[in-house]
Swiss-Prot record:
Its EC number is 3.4.24.-. GO terms for molecular function: metal ion binding; metalloendopeptidase activity; toxin activity. It comes from Agkistrodon piscivorus leucostoma (Western cottonmouth). Residues 21-189 form a propeptide. PROSITE patterns: ADAM_MEPRO, ZINC_PROTEASE. Zn(2+) binds at residues 333, 337, 343. InterPro entries: MetalloPept_cat_dom_sf, Peptidase_M12B, Peptidase_M12B_N, Reprolysin_adamalysin. Binds 1 zinc ion per subunit. Expressed by the venom gland. This is Snake venom metalloproteinase VMP1. Glycans are attached at residue 311.
Length: 411
């Protein structure tokens, strides 16, 4: 039986109108201070895990009480999840950390059917939730009062860069559009049922990422875990579960040539993934997370309909924002291209301010797929019938032993 924890957040809700605070997400105006307080622990004598399977939080937002229900995202990691980094002399070091009792949750707001939440509880509450159609961020404050958190609307974060940010979808690797048009589905609402699919994901953080985060692999790891948790939340309506099977940090040097020309970097990464990564770690899709600034305002690139192809089931994503879910949205967008989704045009709708497959990142990023994207995805399943995303992640997915010189550490 799942023990449910009730935590009351006593809100000395102090909105600082017109003043600014510097948070991890950037400069924020108009925020509230909240103080979490645990009031209903698990029954006396019960074994309490570090992170409960289900939790509830009470808090006030804009002066109104809300209840946040959270459930652990148990499918976030595969059973053989591994982390790889490199020693100063270039040796590959792979560990298999125990991640069953992790701290990443999905959730909803009570009495708000349209609400969503993606929260980590690793060090306080950190993440985002949607309430009454608006996106809010929450994060702990670095104050002497360790329980203080800030809650604020996404729109109140000062924008880091007003320059347009675009996706550079790659279509010239294989002509998919003619086949797609021949099989284009005209779906009634009743037909838009999505079959269960599973994507085993590997994320590579390049050397610039390692330097950007001041050589702190733990920070990169938490950043990536939070991103994949959000990607899972985004794809839940399409019935796709993402399991992170591996995280690799190029801590010594890049293993490919990473340049500001996004197409060159994508091709180089795709070739490395096919010839090196696939031989030592079975997976369905690999994404390169880089701190380089790509030319022409591009922040992501991926081949169209490449999922399950050894050379095309890849993407590159620029770590362009201090706000985790903005980067997660770009990675979800690029994976959408891998799953057959083209860019939305003006005829596409999703019931939101913007849709996730727009060619440019909007000022109010959306986590919603349009009707066009859903049709594209179902058409991709029908035309390509990708086999690699049929199986659930298993512990036996490691297909070969590491080459001589690697260190294998069981944590």
């Amino acid at each position: 039986m799942i023990q449910v924890l009730l935590v009351t957040i006593c809100l000395a809700a102090f909105p600082y109108q017109g003043s600014s605070i510097i948070l991890e997400s950037g400069n924020v105006n108009d925020y509230e201070i909240v103080y979490p307080r645990k009031v209903t622990p698990v029954p006396r004598g019960a074994v309490q895990p570090k992170y409960e399977d289900a939790m509830q939080y009470e808090l006030k937002v804009n002066g109104e009480p809300v209840v946040l229900h959270l459930e652990k995202n148990k499918g976030l990691f595969s059973e053989d999840y591994s982390e790889t980094h490199y020693s100063p002399d270039g040796r590959e070091i792979t560990t298999y950390p125990l991640v069953e009792d992790h701290c990443y949750y999905h959730g909803r707001i009570e009495n708000d059917a349209d609400s969503t939440a993606s929260i980590s509880t690793c060090n306080g509450l950190k993440g985002h939730f949607k309430l009454q159609g608006e996106m809010y961020l929450i994060e702990p404050l670095e104050l002497s009062d360790s329980e203080a958190h800030a809650v604020y609307k996404y729109e109140n974060v000062e924008k880091e860069d007003e320059a347009p940010k675009m996706c550079g979808v790659t279509q010239n690797w294989e002509s998919y559009e003619p086949t797609k048009k021949a099989f284009q589905l005209n779906l009634t609402p009743e037909q838009q049922g999505f079959p269960q699919r599973y994507v085993e994901l590997v994320i590579i953080a390049d050397h610039r990422m390692y330097m950007k985060y001041k050589r702190d692999s733990n920070k990169i790891t938490q950043w990536v875990h939070q991103m994949v948790n959000t990607i899972n939340e985004i794809y839940r309506p399409l019935n796709i579960q993402f399991a992170l099977v591996g995280l690799e940090i190029w801590s010594n040097q890049d293993l490919i040539t990473v340049t500001s020309v996004s197409d060159d970097t994508l091709i180089s990464f795709a070739n490395w993934r096919e010839t090196v990564l696939l031989r030592r770690k079975s997976h369905d899709n690999a994404q390169l997370l880089t701190a380089i600034v790509f030319d022409e305002g591009i922040i992501g690139r991926a081949p169209l309909a490449g999922m399950c192809d050894p050379n095309r089931s890849v993407g590159t994503v620029q770590d362009h924002s201090k706000i985790n879910f903005r980067v997660a949205i770009i990675m979800a967008h690029e994976i959408g291209h891998n799953l057959g989704m083209g860019h939305d045009d003006n005829s596409c709708t999703c019931g939101g301010y913007s849709c996730i497959m727009l060619p440019r990142l909007s000022k109010q990023p959306s986590k919603l797929f349009s009707d066009c994207s859903k049709k594209d995805y179902l058409t991709f399943l029908k035309v390509k019938n990708p086999q690699c995303i049929l199986n659930k992640p298993l512990r036996t997915d490691t297909v070969s032993t590491p080459v001589s010189g690697n260190e294998l550490l069981e944590a």
